[in-house]
Amino acid sequence: MKAWIISDIHSSRLDLLHRRPLIIPRADICICAGDISDNVERSIDFLHNEIAPHMPVVLTLGNHDYYGSSIDSALEYARKWTAGTNVHLLENSTFEKNDLRVIGSTLWTDFEIVDHEYGHLPVDERRRLAIQESMRYLLDFRLIHRVDPLLGVDSLLEPDEMIIRHWDSRAFIDGELGKPFTGTSMVLTHHAISRRSLDPRFAGQVTNAAFASDLTEIIRRRKPHFWIHGHIHRHADYVEGDTRVLCNPRGYLHEGSNGFRPGFVIETSVADTEERSDG
C-alpha cells in the first residue's frame, strides 16, 4: 500500500494569498500526524475538502488542532464529523485496512526527555524545570482549555493533564503492539518519540521536553515497522532498532526550508518497503 506521510500543514487563509496550495500525490492512503490548522473545526473541514476526496485519511490531532477548545471537546467534535467518512481519527485507537495496522494517539509528553544542560539532575527536578519553561513559552497553556463538568472547572490546560494523557497513550500503544498482527504495524503520534527527531536549531533548549518523549524502549521491544510523528518542524527519516521513524512537516510559511517533501509516499508492505516520492 502506498502511504502519503504528512503533518503540520498549518492551513490558513494566507496559503491562498501566497499561492501555497497543498500538492496531493498519488497514494492509497494519507497518514496525517496532526496540526492541520489552529482549531478542530477548520482542521476537519480541510481534510474533508482537500484530501479525503482523493484517498482515505488516517489522522491523529496535534496540539494546535485543540486550540480554542478542551481536549475532550475537540475529540468529540472530530469523532462526530468523521464518523462514516473517508477520514479516520485515532486517539488511543487502531485502524486496520488490508495488511496495514495503524495505532494512533496525540501522545502529548512526559516532560522528561534529556536534551539540555540539566540532564544530570534527578528526573523529578528535570521535569519541574521543563514544565516551568514550557508554561512560559508554549501557547498550549493559553489556548487549550481544561474542562471538568463534575468539578465545575473551566480553566486552561495544565501540564499534569498532558502527562496523564501521555502515559495513558503510551500504555495503549504498548498494549496494541503486543497483539498479534499479520502485516505492517505503524504507530501514528503527533508528538515525537526520540531525541533523534529534535530540531538541531533548538539543541539544548529545556522546552524540547514539550516536543518529544523517549519511547525508544517500546520501539526496540515491540518493533513496529513504522512510527510516524509530527510536531517537530524538520523532516526526519531514520531507523531506531528495527523501526523506521518518519516526520514530514509542511510547517509555517515564514519558516522557509525544513526539508518538507510534498509528495513523500512510502510503500507500507513488509515485503517491499522502498520509498517513492512524487515531489
PLM feature segments, named:
Residues 10-16, 38-42, 64-74, 94-97, ...:
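Active-site environment of divalent metal-dependent phosphoester hydrolases
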Residues 199-201, 205-225, 233-279:
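Binuclear metal-dependent phosphoesterase catalytic core
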Residues 44-48, 73-77, 205-213:
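Charged helix-capping and loop-helix junction motifs
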Residues 5-7, 30-35, 58-63, 88-92, ...:
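Active-site neighborhood of phospho(di)ester-bond hydrolases with catalytic His/Asp-centered motifs
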Residues 103-186, 193-202:
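Active-site-proximal loop/helix segment associated with metal-binding centers of metalloenzymes
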Residues 58-65, 70-126:
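A basic- and aromatic-enriched beta-loop-alpha substructure that forms the phosphate/nucleotide-
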Residues 1-4, 94-104, 239-244:
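Beta-strand-turn-beta hairpins that frame and shape the catalytic cleft
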Residues 1-60, 66-74, 152, 159, ...:
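N-terminal active-site segment of His-dependent metallophosphoesterases
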